[in-house]
Amino acid sequence: MNPLVYFSSQSENTHRFICRVDLPALRIPIATEQPALKVDRPYILVVPSYGGGSTKGAVPRQVIIFLNDPHNRAYLRGVIAAGNTNFGAAYCIAGDIIAQKCQVPYLYRFELLGTAEDVANVRKGVTEFWQQQTT
């Protein structure tokens, strides 16, 4: 199965969610001094939303750098976003921004660490998404 590619800050919320989903995954490094992640096959991006309710700064800088690499961007097939409902209309807005800019489907959104239902939905949805891509 093709991987999930994700970014998680030092809070580790997205990382903990990815661990619970238990599918193949690659992590975009937190520190820009670390070696850049290069993907070599199609992937779904899982991204937290930042900015406290504003669209400015909603997509983490590390994710922008990752997607600005044409090689990485070419393999992007979909996006899943994490967020905080306290952000109101900007809840999970990083997913909206990336899906629109990269012309890929926005597959799912979840709050903070996600619930057991979110984990099951993502696991099932990702599996079905890749099965549809191969038929």
Swiss-Prot record:
One GO biological process term: protein modification process
Superkingdom of the organism of origin: Bacteria
Family annotation (Gene3D superfamilies): 3.40.50.360
Stored InterPro entries: Flavoprotein-like_sf, RNR_Ib_NrdI_bac, RNR_NrdI
SUPFAM superfamilies for this protein: Flavoproteins
GO molecular function, a single term: FMN binding
Role: Probably involved in ribonucleotide reductase function.
PANTHER family, A to Z: PROTEIN NRDI
Entry's family note: Belongs to the NrdI family.
Protein's recorded name: Protein NrdI
